[in-house]
C-alpha cells in the first residue's frame, strides 16, 4: 500500500509495472482503432460499379409495415388526430418548427382541438393554441432565446445571491413579459386565462407543471385552472430548478411553489385520455366526484387517464432526444426507415459533439476487443492448467502464452507489446507466492474491465463539473426514470421520435446550420411517422386475422424496452 500521508507518496513497484502495461495496451488499442477507421473508409469508397461495400437493409428483411410505408405519400391520406402533445426538451424544441411544417403541409394543424406540452413543449403548444401559424412560429423560435430566458442582472455574479433569495439564478421576468406580448398579439390580453382562451377559440390547452409543495405534477387546463393566466403556467413549466427561479402561486388561500413540469412528467401523452380533462358534461367534476365512497379509486391516475382504445389514435405526441441521450422510445422510433440523422454540420457545436461521439465509438471498440481477448486468455489458461487446481504456475502461464489459441493480438491487447511471460507473471502474481490464484486473476481482469468501463461510461454519463451541470443532470435522471410511470407500450403508435443530433437541452446558441439541421430532423421524423401510421391503417383494414395480429404485435415489442 502506498503511504498517502506526509509530503512523500510511496508507490508500490507492482503498480508502476501495472501502469506501464496499461499504457502499452492503450497505445496498441489506439493503433488498432486507427486501422479500423482506415478499413471503414476503404469500405465507404465506391468501386467501379458505384458500390461502397456497405450493407444496407434489403427488402427481403423488411416487415409488412415497412414495405408498405415506403410506398406511402402522406399527402394522399387523412389522419384522425385531434390532440397534439409536445415533450419538453429545452433547445431541442427548435425541432418542433420542422414537425409543425410537416403537419401544416398536410392540413393537420387546422383539425387539432387540444394542445398540451411541457417546458419548451408548453411554449409550442401555447403558441399554436392561440393561433400562430408556421411562419410566425419559426420567426419566434428563430430568435436568440438565450437572451430572453437568461435574465439575471449581473450574469454569473448574480448566481449565489439569486439562489439564496429566489432559489434560482434567473428570475424569468424577461421571458414572462416577452411571452405575454406574444399572447397579447393574438388574444388581445397578456394575461389571457385558460377559460378566456377556451371561450374565444373553442380550443383546449394543457400545460404540465410540478407542484413542489405537493410533490406531484399538475395539469393547468380550462377545467382545472380556469382563472390562471396562460403565461403564468408556461413560466412555471420552463422553470428548470437552479437555472430559473420557481413561481409562487396562490389559489384558494394556499400558496404553492411550482417548477418545470418535466421534473416529474416530461411527456404527458396521456393527458387527454380518460375523464380528468374531458369537457364532456358527463365527465364534470360535479358528476364524477359525487360518489365520495369511490373517490380514491376515481382519483387514481390509472382511472383519471384511462385510455379508451377507440380514442387512442386521436392523440399525436412528439418526443425529443439528442444523439447522446437515452429515451425509452428511441430504440423503436429509430427503426422507422427515413428518420436517420443527416451529417452533423461543420459548426462550433457540431465539431465539439462530433469529437465526443468519436471518442465514444472508440471506447466501444476497445471494450469489444478486450472482452474477446479476455475470453481467449481464460480459455487457454483453463486448457493448460494441467493439474486442474485453482492456481496457475509460471510453466502453465508460459504454455498458455505459446499456445496458438492465444493470439498475438489478444496478448498485446491485455499486456501491451513486447511483454514477456515473466513480466506478465510478475504482474498477475501480486502476492509474490509463485502462483497465480483465482482471486489474483480475477482482480487483473476486473482492473482491465473497470478501466474500459469507466472510459466508456465517461462518454455516456453526465459530467457534473459545475452548478448548472448538476441541475441539468438531475433533470435528465428524473426524465429517464420517471417517464416510465406515464407511458405504456401502446403509446409508441402515437409518438413521433425526433433525434436532434448534436443539439442538446441547453444548446440555445445555435448557428444557422445547427438550426436548419434540427428543423429538418423534426420535419422528416414527422413525415416518416405519418407514412408508417398510414401504412399500418391500410394493412389493418385489408388484412386477415393472422396478419392483423402480426401488425399489432410490432408495438408490443416496446414492452420489453419499458421493462429493461
Describe the role of every protein-language-model region.
Residues 2-118, 126-564:
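Patatin-like phospholipase
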Amino acid at each position: 500500500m502506498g503511504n498517502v500521508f506526509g509530503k512523500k507518496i510511496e508507490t508500490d513497484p507492482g503498480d508502476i509495472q501495472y501502469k506501464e502495461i496499461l499504457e502499452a495496451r492503450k497505445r496498441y488499442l489506439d493503433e488498432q482503432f486507427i486501422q479500423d477507421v482506415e478499413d471503414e473508409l476503404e469500405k465507404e469508397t465506391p468501386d467501379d460499379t458505384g458500390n461502397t461495400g456497405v450493407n444496407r437493409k434489403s427488402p427481403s428483411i423488411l416487415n409488412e409495415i415497412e414495405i408498405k410505408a415506403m410506398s406511402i405519400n402522406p399527402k394522399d391520406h387523412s389522419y384522425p388526430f385531434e390532440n397534439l402533445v409536445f415533450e419538453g426538451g429545452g433547445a431541442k424544441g427548435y425541432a418542433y418548427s420542422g414537425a409543425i411544417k410537416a403537419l401544416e403541409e398536410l392540413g393537420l394543424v387546422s383539425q387539432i382541438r387540444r394542445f398540451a406540452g411541457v417546458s419548451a413543449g408548453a411554449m409550442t403548444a401555447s403558441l399554436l393554441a392561440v393561433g400562430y401559424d408556421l411562419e410566425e412560429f419559426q420567426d419566434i423560435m428563430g430568435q436568440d432565446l438565450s437572451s430572453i430566458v437568461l435574465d439575471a442582472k449581473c450574469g454569473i455574479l448574480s448566481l449565489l445571491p439569486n439562489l439564496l433569495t429566489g432559489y434560482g439564478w434567473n428570475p424569468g421576468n424577461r421571458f414572462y413579459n416577452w411571452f405575454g406580448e406574444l399572447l397579447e398579439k393574438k388574444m388581445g390580453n397578456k394575461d389571457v386565462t385558460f377559460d378566456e382562451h377556451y371561450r374565444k377559440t373553442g380550443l383546449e390547452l394543457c400545460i404540465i407543471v410540478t407542484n413542489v409543495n405537493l410533490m406531484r405534477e399538475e395539469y393547468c387546463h380550462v377545467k382545472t385552472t380556469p382563472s390562471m393566466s396562460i403565461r403564468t403556467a408556461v413560466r412555471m413549466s420552463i422553470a428548470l430548478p437552479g437555472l430559473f427561479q420557481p413561481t409562487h402561486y396562490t389559489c384558494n388561500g394556499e400558496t404553492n411553489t411550482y417548477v418545470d413540469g418535466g421534473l416529474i412528467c416530461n411527456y404527458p401523452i396521456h393527458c387527454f385520455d380518460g375523464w380528468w380533462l374531458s369537457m364532456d358534461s358527463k365527465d364534470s367534476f360535479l358528476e364524477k366526484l359525487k360518489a365520495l365512497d369511490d373517490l380514491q379509486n376515481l382519483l387514481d391516475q390509472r382511472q383519471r387517464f384511462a385510455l379508451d382504445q377507440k380514442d387512442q389514435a386521436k392523440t399525436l405526441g412528439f418526443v425529443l432526444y439528442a444523439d447522446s441521450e437515452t429515451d425509452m422510445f428511441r430504440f423503436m422510433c429509430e427503426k422507422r426507415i427515413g428518420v436517420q440523422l443527416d451529417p452533423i454540420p461543420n459548426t462550433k457545436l457540431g465539431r465539439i459533439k462530433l469529437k465526443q461521439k468519436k471518442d465514444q465509438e472508440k471506447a466501444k471498440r476497445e471494450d469489444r476487443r478486450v472482452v474477446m481477448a479476455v475470453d481467449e486468455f481464460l480459455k487457454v489458461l483453463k486448457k493448460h492448467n494441467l493439474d486442474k487446481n485453482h492456481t496457475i504456475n509460471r510453466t502453465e502461464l508460459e504454455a498458455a502464452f505459446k499456445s496458438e489459441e492465444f493470439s498475438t493480438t489478444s496478448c498485446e491487447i491485455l499486456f501491451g507489446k513486447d511483454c514477456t511471460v515473466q513480466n506478465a507473471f510478475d504482474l498477475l502474481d501480486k502476492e509474490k507466492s509463485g502462483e497465480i490464484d483465482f482471486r489474483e486473476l480475477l482482480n487483473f481482469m476486473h482492473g482491465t474491465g473497470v478501466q474500459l468501463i469507466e472510459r466508456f461510461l465517461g462518454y455516456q454519463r453526465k459530467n457534473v463539473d459545475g452548478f448548472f451541470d448538476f441541475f441539468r443532470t438531475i433533470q435528465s435522471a428524473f426524465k429517464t426514470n420517471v417517464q416510465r410511470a406515464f407511458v405504456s407500450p401502446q403509446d409508441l403508435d402515437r409518438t413521433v421520435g425526433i433525434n436532434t443530433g448534436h443539439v442538446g437541452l441547453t444548446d440555445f446558441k445555435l448557428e444557422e446550420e445547427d438550426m436548419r439541421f434540427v428543423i429538418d430532423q423534426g420535419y422528416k421524423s414527422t413525415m416518416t411517422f405519418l407514412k408508417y401510421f398510414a401504412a399500418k391503417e391500410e394493412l389493418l383494414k385489408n388484412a386477415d386475422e393472422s396478419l392483423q395480429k402480426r401488425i399489432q404485435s410490432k408495438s408490443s415489442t416496446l414492452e420489453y424496452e419499458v421493462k429493461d
